[in-house]
Amino acid sequence: MASSKSLMNLLTFSFGSAIGFFLCYLLFSMILEEQVEIQPHILHNDPHGQHSEDTDNNQLQGQMNFNADSGQHRDENRNIADGLYEKVKILCWVMTGPQNLEKKARHVKATWAQRCNKILFMSSEENKDFPTVGLETKEGRDQLYWKTIKAFQYVYDHYFDDADWFMKADDDTYVILDNLRWLLSKYSPEQPIYFGRRFKPYVKQGYMSGGAGYVLSKEALKRFVTAFKTNKCSHSSSIEDLALGKCMEIINVQAGDSRDTSGRETFHPFVPEHLLIRGYLPKTFWYWNYNYYPAVEGPGCCSDLAVSFHYVDSMTMYHLEYLVYHLRPYGYSYRYDPDSAKGLEEQNKNEAQEDNPKLKQKTSEN
């Protein structure tokens, strides 16, 4: 009798434990699944991938007005930024499509696009309400270079005299125009040059990542558009950034160095956490082999005067807007001297020595 009672207790305990373990497993599975679903950013395995996809979890419903609290910044000294706005005129055009106007482009329009001297949204078809410029192309990744060519042709035909520099960005790119103006202020728009995140495969002088955005000087734009009229360049590839880079090399447009005076990158093909957190990008990831200059992970990855970030979903667009233009630490004066070029000159000298052993030996002898 006692043994039967013990057996019953054992079975009851075992059954209860099994139920408990099952419920715990179910609960943790639901929690982990939810965490995976709300993860806003994933690794993008294509170096030439152009757009992120907003899921239902990270797609913002409605548009935010970040200018509503502008009174809080009325005492802020913007003299330098305002002066550069007049001195370095930038036309921005954003690559988008009919399906992305509400999901992506409207949030670009509500944030950084307001700081362009002129903003255009380029789509396959016209939308007078948004508005967009209709390029009369098809949608799809295989159409990206063709859309880029037609967009720059449209800008050249209609707005060439309205700006000095011409910036192309995606509808999931966040751009800090004030920092871009500082970078460009060191150069003449009559110089054949363009800037962006410089990649190295396939093009001798390198080419600029499409997702991080790139900016052409007035002379570079003129040469690019003319090259298609004279058949120096052609629509020979669907890979937008690489094809444009090859064309730029053919027409002798220089791939500029967009790093700051400390040698840190300003254009970024990913969101900040991918670059700031060591180990986020595995060493087998394509990114490490594509950078023209040695890539850095951790805080040294990114300039204090960063220009752009890519794969920015609609919610992160406003996160960046707040962090860049609204958040201020109390009691600090700006600590960085962007006009001191000694740091980058020294770094370029060291890189030249590493590439040229004879120069390195001569320097050590001196």
From Swiss-Prot:
It catalyses: an N-acetyl-alpha-D-galactosaminyl derivative + UDP-alpha-D-galactose = a beta-D-galactosyl-(1->3)-N-acetyl-alpha-D-galactosaminyl derivative + UDP + H(+). The keyword Transmembrane applies. Disulfide bonds join 92-116, 233-247, 301-302. It comes from the Eukaryota. It is found in: Membrane. Pathway: Protein modification; protein glycosylation. Residues 32-366 are lumenal. Glycosyltransferase that generates the core 1 O-glycan Gal-beta1-3GalNAc-alpha1-Ser/Thr (T antigen), which is a precursor for many extended O-glycans in glycoproteins. Belongs to the glycosyltransferase 31 family. Beta3-Gal-T subfamily. Homodimer; disulfide-linked. This is Glycoprotein-N-acetylgalactosamine 3-beta-galactosyltransferase 1.
